[in-house]
Each structure stands twice: as structure tokens, then as C-alpha cells.
């Protein structure tokens, strides 16, 4: 049973976060190890394993990047944990320039404007990956995921800069 089936959801990039959360809470309640405290050793072990599976699946599905990676895995393209380098020099140059721009920011307004710019870039790549998945262009979707990881890391660096500068 895959993660989507576990939560009773279709295998799609776009999903209802509220429904995912509700299903997660329901499955947690249903398979919580405390509910099996008087059960056999085997059933207690199975409930612990099921609870761990539910937690793992939820973590994968709630994060858009890991959700895309999982959809790719289900379709035979596994890029999790790979160390393949991006082959897009323009994108890599843009990332270097963005990081240099971030390093030079000292004012709150400039940081918020920069954050807005990076969020727009992130949303555009999310839209691209969604379109590529819908068109079954799996290798292109995988390349977008690689780019999204760079952008997600930059978003994290923005949060760190915000804490450092204005924290």
C-alpha cells in the first residue's frame, strides 16, 4: 500500500491539506499503540509499525517537494538521496547571484522584498513541476525537483538571515 492509498487520497501532486491532516489524525487515533495495550505482543508490535508508517507517510505527503519525489518513485523515477548535479548553468548562475544578493542585504525592507522574489520563483517552479507531472514528463519533473531543492534551501537561508539580522 502506498502513502496515498494509506490516506485514501488520489495519487496527485495537488492535494487537500485539510483532508490529509484529518485522515492523519484519524489513522493516528485508530492505530495508536495505547489502543493495543491489552492486545497480544504481535498486535502491539503491528500497531507500533503501523503508527510509524502513518507518521512517515504523513511527513512525505505534507511536504510538496517530498510528495513530488514520492510520486516520481511510484512512476519509476527515484531521485531521493541522489547526488546528481544540475545541468542547467543558467539556473545555477541565478542561484549564485541570489545568494550573493542575500549576503548583501542589511535592511528589513530589502529582505522582505527579496523573500517575496524567491517565493514567486518557488511558486513558479511548483507550477512547472505540477504541469510536468500532469503531462507525464517525469524526467523534466525530476529536474524541477532538483531546482526546487535549491530554492527551498535559499528560503531557509532567508529565514536564517532574518533571525540573524532582526531576531
Q: Can you describe what each PLM-predicted range is?
A:
Residues 1-167:
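C-terminal accessory/regulatory regions appended to core domains
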Amino acid at each position: 500500500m502506498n502513502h496515498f492509498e494509506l490516506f485514501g487520497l488520489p495519487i496527485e501532486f495537488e492535494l487537500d491539506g485539510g483532508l490529509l491532516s484529518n485522515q492523519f489524525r484519524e489513522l493516528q487515533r485508530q492505530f495508536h499503540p495505547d489502543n493495543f495495550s491489552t492486545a497480544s505482543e504481535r498486535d502491539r508490535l503491528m500497531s507500533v509499525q503501523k503508527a510509524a508508517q502513518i507518521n512517515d507517510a504523513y511527513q512525505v505527503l505534507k511536504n510538496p517537494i517530498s510528495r513530488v519525489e514520492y510520486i516520481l518513485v511510484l512512476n519509476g523515477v527515484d531521485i531521493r538521496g541522489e547526488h546528481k548535479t544540475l545541468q542547467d548553468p543558467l539556473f545555477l548562475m541565478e542561484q549564485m547571484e541570489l545568494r550573493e544578493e542575500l549576503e548583501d542585504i542589511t535592511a528589513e525592507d530589502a529582505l522582505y522584498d527579496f523573500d517575496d522574489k524567491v517565493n514567486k520563483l518557488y511558486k513558479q517552479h511548483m507550477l512547472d513541476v505540477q504541469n510536468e507531472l500532469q503531462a507525464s514528463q517525469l524526467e523534466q519533473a525530476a529536474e524541477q525537483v532538483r531546482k526546487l531543492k535549491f530554492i527551498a534551501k535559499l528560503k531557509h537561508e532567508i529565514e536564517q538571515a532574518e533571525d540573524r539580522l532582526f531576531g
